[in-house]
Amino acid sequence: MVKVEFAGDVKNLTSYIEKDAKAKIDSVVEEAVKEAEKLLNEKKEELLERAVVDVEKLLSDAQARLSAEKSSIDMEVRRKVEERKKELFQKVVEEAWKRALEEAEKKTERYKKFLEKVLIAMSNEAGEDEVIAYVRADDLEDVRAMVQEKGLKNVVEVKDVKEVGREIKGGVLGKSKSGGVWYNYTLEKAFDELLREVYPKVLEALGF
């Protein structure tokens, strides 16, 4: 009969249990670690994905802002260019008008040719209508001579424009003798028409 050594058996059993328990614990820990790593990797991917999305969103937002700012800057530049155009054009206009007034004031040959030209144009427009030509006091003598010289028979009178309560810088303001029609051939009207005609050319000359 074999004598059972309980002490040894217990010791061996205890050792086995400890090993088995340790193995199970290690297994559980290993599984837990793997699960944790898996979760961590998933979260890491999620975080990375979110980070990429966030970066792309930031870049997209930044691009949108830059685009908006560029559009705003472009609009501001265009606005300033337009303002500059107007300023330069206004200076050209003012200088041209100043010269026109000087020509009229000095009654230069160029102004006299202009006066003759508009007087004939007014007479032609009036046709069979008899008209009274109203001019500046300084131009009365010259215009009366032109009417005779050019044989403008429908221009029946030449008077000072102030008689009808008007003031002009030059040229001729005609009125039908019946009083129903006015013919505007003043220096002011001619200058306005000239501006509309040469405006594009002036802008081109200014580099726009």
From Swiss-Prot:
Q: What is this protein called?
A: A-type ATP synthase subunit E
The protein's GO terms of the molecular function aspect are:
ATP binding; proton-transporting ATP synthase activity, rotational mechanism; proton-transporting ATPase activity, rotational mechanism
Tell me the keywords, alphabetical order: ATP synthesis, Cell membrane, Hydrogen ion transport, Ion transport, Membrane, Transport
Indicate yes or no for the key word Transport.
Answer: yes
Q: What binding partners and quaternary form does the record give?
A: Has multiple subunits with at least A(3), B(3), C, D, E, F, H, I and proteolipid K(x).
A Pfam short name:
vATP-synt_E
- Report the principal subcellular site: membrane
Matching SUPFAM superfamilies: V-type ATPase subunit E-like (SSF160527)
Q: How does it sit in the membrane?
A: Peripheral membrane protein
A GO biological-process term: proton motive force-driven plasma membrane ATP synthesis
Q: Mind telling me which HAMAP family this protein's record contains? A: ATP_synth_E_arch
**Membership in a protein family:** Belongs to the V-ATPase E subunit family.
Please name the source species. Ignicoccus hospitalis (strain KIN4/I / DSM 18386 / JCM 14125)
Location within or outside the cell? Cell membrane
**Source lineage:** Archaea, Thermoproteota, Thermoprotei, Desulfurococcales, Desulfurococcaceae
InterPro entries linked: ATPase_E_C, ATPase_V1_Esu
According to the UniProt record, one GO cellular component term is: plasma membrane
Q: Which purpose does this protein serve, as stated in its record? A: Component of the A-type ATP synthase that produces ATP from ADP in the presence of a proton gradient across the membrane.
UniProt keyword Repeat, yes or no: no
